């Protein structure tokens, strides 16, 4: 995505609405080969659909996975000072250092699944404004974060897994989802890093206050919700999703916070996240509600709530297996196996 000048948010809207469509010829070619493989039709379930998805958005059959990556965006939040997380804000920078040293869960998962890992900290010494009383970002700050996220969608990637790190960021994610989909705050708020009882009540009140400040004002487009309620890492996730679509890169979305970013894009144009699959269903209670609102079915359900693109990176292993089956299996003719009677 080129640098967006002028009315930056309008430029981002336009970018979403001019996204390329799925390659129907590639889908048809995958289905044709699948019918010839030594198995009953449909017997590999979602693995077959995953290969069709890869082909549709890469625009080729067979699809490939020669260059796959995971990206973790990190940001800090002014609302964290209200005790909405079990951890202090300095943990964001400390975890970025841990990522860079190779000591986090995502480092191990990315390595195990053949993913190049990138960590993108965004102005950690400059938290967003406290969303209870002020807009999180200016238009320029939001657009800059979107552009930064877009820059990770390199043209040579075959698959992109995206996630985040940011103490307190399930609070802005919950606020975005409530603003987009409605309902009371408590159905969109969960424990995040492990808050409970009074701290959880405090988190719900923070989301209620933030959304009440925004709803009914002029700035209520999806990107305005992102700007006013979100965070830099969430905006970067939005940029990565949008640019990946234009570069025909299939995307695996991580958990609750990354899904909130996908929801922003979906709210602009529902088909604009068709190139995305949800890697896993988070243990964060509202994640199920969010993915249902997007019409998505997560690939995995492992009771995880870590973030860090960990669930998306694990799902990349399923995607690799699906493609290996599709490209490596013999056809009935090649194997000398009698096909089903018709």
Curated annotation (Swiss-Prot):
Its EC number is 2.4.2.21. Coiled coil: none annotated. The active site is at 308 (proton acceptor). InterPro entries: Nict_dMeBzImd_PRibTrfase, Nict_dMeBzImd_PRibTrfase_bact, Nict_dMeBzImd_PRibTrfase_N, Nict_dMeBzImd_PRibTrfase_sf. Keywords: Cobalamin biosynthesis, Glycosyltransferase, Plasmid, Transferase. Catalyzes the synthesis of alpha-ribazole-5'-phosphate from nicotinate mononucleotide (NAMN) and 5,6-dimethylbenzimidazole (DMB). Belongs to the CobT family. This is Nicotinate-nucleotide--dimethylbenzimidazole phosphoribosyltransferase. The gene is cobT.
